[in-house]
């Protein structure tokens, strides 16, 4: 069983005695910074020169500095920049400006697990990773609740890394729900596998193949869209609420019976073997090496794959159908319809 921690297991004053620099102000960065501030922590945000997020952070009343300036002021540096940017950011702006005995806090273990960032042995290195998007982390905190977090320690140079990690987790509201003890390796490998085999890669491919199967058989694309993509939210919401059993309880007997007899025909043992191969690439570093090499080259493979996905017929059909959905309101003002680019 996993080891769990709650508010009573952490001393908030530990992080309140520190000066914290949150590097990055995206989905997680803004939630961490605001929750820390509202928990009485001395926090500043480190952003690159010209960052579009500067005004947003300043409008929230946060102190905003360049990354080197923020790091120089801090006892705790929270690295929440995208995985592919962390290595360069750490080498150029963070590492040269670290104070002795600084604690590094990560929201994901990628760069530590695969060795792209190698902190010196005198630093504490911890991870506090909420299991939800930043807007939910912030909203739950404001409402007096919290999103569960996973907590790990990679280096404990001072002997106080766990105490600080739990204090930090409490400050962002995570221990109101629960903190789950893990390792950088476990978090990274399970997170990447889940994204690739199920949550992103697996589901996206399954939906596209379902759409292609129906339209190639002569069914209307609009009807196919409803059956394989639109209604997916209804099923996922039921799973989210009560697991697979709750989903099966909620659907018709016809749908439940079809689940049992046809699901294994589509997702057969070969799929599990393919999943095991994906996991192996995550474990041995092959995926990480491929991703970082492509990013270092300007991301040509990434751009090609993204463009291919955007050009799939289901995207055009969906754009037109969603115009009919008065109940669906765009939640991201900076999103361009039909594009995965950020």
UniProtKB/Swiss-Prot annotation:
Q: Which PANTHER family match?
A: KETOL-ACID REDUCTOISOMERASE, MITOCHONDRIAL
Q: Name one GO molecular function term.
A: NADP binding
Question: What enzyme category does the UniProt record give?
Answer: oxidoreductase
Species name: Beutenbergia cavernae (strain ATCC BAA-8 / DSM 12333 / CCUG 43141 / JCM 11478 / NBRC 16432 / NCIMB 13614 / HKI 0122)
Disulfide-bonded cysteines: none
Q: In its UniProt entry, what is this protein called? A: Ketol-acid reductoisomerase (NADP(+))
The cofactor remark states: Binds 2 magnesium ions per subunit.
Q: What is the lineage of its organism?
A: Bacteria, Bacillati, Actinomycetota, Actinomycetes, Micrococcales
Tell me the pathway. Answer: Amino-acid biosynthesis; L-isoleucine biosynthesis; L-isoleucine from 2-oxobutanoate: step 2/4; Amino-acid biosynthesis; L-valine biosynthesis; L-valine from pyruvate: step 2/4
């Amino acid at each position: 069983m996993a080891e769990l921690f709650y508010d009573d297991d952490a001393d908030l004053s530990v992080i309140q005695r520190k000066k914290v620099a949150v590097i990055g102000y995206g989905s997680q960065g803004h939630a961490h910074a605001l929750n820390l501030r509202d928990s009485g922590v001395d926090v500043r945000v480190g952003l690159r020169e010209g960052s579009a997020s500067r005004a947003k952070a300043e409008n929230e009343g946060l102190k905003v500095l360049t990354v080197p300036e923020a790091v120089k002021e801090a006892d705790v540096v929270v690295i929440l920049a995208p995985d592919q940017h962390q290595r360069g950011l750490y080498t150029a702006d963070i590492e040269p400006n670290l104070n002795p005995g600084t604690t590094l806090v990560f929201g994901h273990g990628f760069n530590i697990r695969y060795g792209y960032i190698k902190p010196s042995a005198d630093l504490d290195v911890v991870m506090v990773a909420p299991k939800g998007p930043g807007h939910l982390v912030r909203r739950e905190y404001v409402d007096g609740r919290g999103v569960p977090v996973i907590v790990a320690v990679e280096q404990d140079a001072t002997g106080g890394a766990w105490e600080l990690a739990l204090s930090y987790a409490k400050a962002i509201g995570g221990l109101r729900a629960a903190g789950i003890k893990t390792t950088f390796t476990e978090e990274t490998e399970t997170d990447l596998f889940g994204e690739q085999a199920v949550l992103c890669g697996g589901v996206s491919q399954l939906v596209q193949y379902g759409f292609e199967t129906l339209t190639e058989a002569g069914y209307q694309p609009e009807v196919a869209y409803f059956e394989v993509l639109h209604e997916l939210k209804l099923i996922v919401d039921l799973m989210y609420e009560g697991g697979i059993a709750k989903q099966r309880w909620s659907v018709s007997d016809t749908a439940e019976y079809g689940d049992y007899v046809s699901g294994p025909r589509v997702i057969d043992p070969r799929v599990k073997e393919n999943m095991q191969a994906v996991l192996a690439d995550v474990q041995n570093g092959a995926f990480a090496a491929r991703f970082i090499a492509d990013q270092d080259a300007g991301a040509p493979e990434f751009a090609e794959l993204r463009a291919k996905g955007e050009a799939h017929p289901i995207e055009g059909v969906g754009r037109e159908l969603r115009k009919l959905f008065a109940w669906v309101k765009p939640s991201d003002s900076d999103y361009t319809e039909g594009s995965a680019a950020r």
